[in-house]
Amino acid sequence: MARYFRRRKFCRFTAEGVQEIDYKDIATLKNYITESGKIVPSRITGTRAKYQRQLARAIKRARYLSLLPYTDRHQ
């Protein structure tokens, strides 16, 4: 029986030395939402709690300003 090798999770924001996550950085924020528009939990992404809170706040601000969608396109 082969064992599945799971890649070690790490926080990209800590590794890059990010101080504050910007709500205008849409390219970064899109990596942390699902196709349906939900915020991906930190247990899946490996993001530290401090940055997960900043990430959630930034995504919610970007949604409010119509930079990110609340949901998918319902086609």
Curated annotation (Swiss-Prot):
The keyword Ribonucleoprotein applies. The keyword rRNA-binding applies. InterPro entries: Ribosomal_bS18, Ribosomal_bS18_CS, Ribosomal_bS18_sf. The modification N-acetylalanine is found at A2. GO terms for biological process: cytoplasmic translation; translation. Belongs to the bacterial ribosomal protein bS18 family. HAMAP family: Ribosomal_bS18 (MF_00270). This is Small ribosomal subunit protein bS18. It comes from Escherichia coli (strain K12).
